[in-house]
Amino acid sequence: MLNKTDVSMLYITIMGMASEGDGNKYWLDYANNNSLGVSSLANIMLDSPGAAKFFGDSLLAGNEKDFVTKIYSIALGNTSDVDGINYWTKAITGGGEFTDSKGNVISVASLSKGDLIGAMINSMVNGGSAESKAIFEAKAAASDYFADATLVRDISGLDEGTTSKLISEINSASDLDKVKSEIDALKSELPNPGSTYDLTEGNDNLKGTDLDDTFNGTTYVGNGTNKSTLSAFDKIDGGAGRDTLNAIFTANNNAAAATKLDQAEIDKSLKGVTNVENINIISDLETSGDFVFNGYEKVGFNVLGDIVSFATDASKSVNVETTGTITAFTAAGTGKVDVVAGKISALTADSATSVNLTATNDTITLTSANAATSVNLKTSGAAKSATITSANAAKNITIDATGVAAVTSATAVENLTVKHATNVTLAGNMDKLATVTLDNAALTAAIDIKSASTLNLINSSVNGHNISTAAKDVTVNLSGSAAKVKLNTTAATDQTVTLKANATDNSLEFDSATAKTTSVTASGSGKTLVIKGAEVETLVNIDTTAFNGAADVSFGKDGQGGKFSVKTGTGDDKIEFVGTTLTEGSVIDGAGNDTIAMKSAALTSANFTMIKNIENVAISDAVATADLSSSAFKNSVIITTKEAADTTLTINKDQVINFTAADAGSVKLITVKLNDVTGANDVVKIVLDAAAKDASIALGTAAADKALVIDTGIETLNITSLVKATSPETTANTVNAKLTDVTSIIIDGDAKITLGHAGTAGTDYSKVSMIDASALKAGLTFDASAITLGANATIKGGSGADSITVKGGNIVVDLVAGGDDTITLKKGAEKTDITTVNNFNAGDKIDIADAKNGTFTFNKITMNSDANLDDYITKAVAGDGSTNSAVSYFLHNGYTYVVVDGTAGATFTKATDTIIKLSGTLDLKLSGDNVVVDDGSVI
């Protein structure tokens, strides 16, 4: 059988709080009625809302160490027992062997979380240090004492966190007596319900009990036949206890439309009321004049309209709610002040313990509340400000304002939370300010958070404006969907920033002119992180290795160097070095597929030796000559800007040039060299990355001084053509190049591409014998009628819609990759200089419009088996095609030939006639100006 203390110990370890009487009894009865032990009950209690609130994400799989650490923190008040924490973590993650800090190998049994809690409780009570045992038992005794004090008592009026505070205050066994005294004080304030009296229309003469009685009455204001149940003729004596009068004031049935509630009407109705500690006035009337309620413990006043002034010395609480403006409000009591109004012009509550003010459609001014430890202000409506003139005892201030959040004097404030505000102004001495939280705030001006060392941003941004802090070590917590902050860190020397980037999109930048930050360490589970550290001269250390997403980091100062340490995590990170020199000892290190952006002046072999595990380099300015061949960049060298001068890039055989600018090479030459061209098949690889800037890549033009040049000794050019991010089907990449010694062009990717020359069509491709786009998931466009290829060249199209123009040349066009392809046939080749097309199929076409006169005629030629190719060609051109071109096709030696006769002569003339050869024996037909496969379909 369990007892009350067993349940108290579970409350402490599972919910971090003392057990209230009814809750302790419920769980105790449940356990004993179901014959549950401590561990079994713990498993059930772990599913309770209280456990979920206390443990949070540490209950989730993968966070078992956080779960154990939380228990240590609340049960023992410290987390220094690393071996113990690791031991229990091992137990709830399947058990097995555990090696402690001394090297001892310990066998650990597998436990459920409930078993763990039971075992830990047993260990704390029956093992471990005497001090830990005494602390835990003192906490359990405090919980038992609170359970006894609150059994069958209403504790809903206690401040949130009271039960947790009772446990957290015990840091040694000697603290128990102090906490018991606090519980005694709380008990004396708890309601002790007595009788409820509903007043009658007659003259009541009532005396309450010694308990907390309640009296309910209604006063009808103005003329009418309704009779009040609360009037000057009633005699109400609350007697002992803490008694409450609920008084309703409403218009009588014949009252004038302008009837209002004033102090005189209230005083008249309360004339016979004595020994009542709490009063609640509720009215649907607008008010008139001034109101004073003195001599009460609690005052409630819920009315309509404006209140010129309101004053009370209520000792425990005052709660006022109205729809209009409160011009002046004075609370002289020592309790809580809660006010809701349309507007609060001036409020003074210098003895109140806490102040909570809400303006439903206008501004708030808290004039003075110099005893309150907690102050909360909230405004609504467009651009409505909240101002605290003086709150010099408040440790915690929350301002939720749609306009400016202003604090003139708050010398004791430690934690400041600002929600939704567009600006924050903090004045006076705030030396104790430690934490500032901006929640869904979009600041339109710079703010100074004094020496606060912790800054929390939840879905907040500063829109380029500074948040200044003089703290030496600053922690910035970003959360929500997007959180962006610009810091002006003004500590004299060695200022550090610890960034916890848990928003989806995170951004940290600095006021580069004045910031003194030396290091930034980032962690978190966000998707993206931007750290703009460029031009902050003191910032030399950046570490994002513990950030799970993709980081974008800039550092260095323009034109300068320094000793830097920049380390990034496993995401695909981007690093920008805006300086020129990495001093010896610098470390630039990545872990994912990372990119570093560098200016051309920084592209030196000395700098390269200090860059590790960075796959890509981006050249961030115009560059004349850059030798990247000695670098360890593996995947790509990226050109990001339009070049203003001729550029020469030297790379090694393992590197790739990735062109991302939509106009790269359109102004000057870009020459690509390999550092070693001694092999027989030296390869240069380039990528046309239209997705990077969401624009098609136009690499070079058909001009000798504005194109891509592949230098001597390079035999193969590999091109990857990639689509744009938006409307990818519209991507049209182009390359105009001079291919000095290139014999093969190999193309892959998913974007259509056009290959062109660099101004000299006769020689720019003159050694190319293979253009292979068979791995391209798009179409290839190439004009072999205008660009001279090497002897017996082959062109292989992609799987998209290719467009290949030919006029002979004894080249082979292979359409094996598929797609609906177009072969454009030009005049100008001899009958012995024939292009061959392989894999010509239904859907493909031969465009013969170039040889068209008038209207095409079309027929199939057949001849005797002893006829040779010249016989067939002679017959095809024997007619008069000068008026209407004659299109003929015939089958010969396993091939299909198409001839267009565009002259009256009986011989083949290259100026007017043309011929093409298709592999295989095909049935053809004419479709407009195109020859296509006759597959039986109707055109």
UniProtKB/Swiss-Prot annotation:
Keyword Calcium (UniProt): yes
Localization annotation: Secreted, Cell wall, S-layer
Gene Ontology terms: cellular component: extracellular region; S-layer
Entry keyword set: Calcium, Cell wall, S-layer, Secreted, Virulence
Role summary: The S-layer is a paracrystalline mono-layered assembly of proteins which coats the surface of bacteria. This protein is critical for virulence.
Record's protein name: S-layer protein
Organism name: Campylobacter fetus
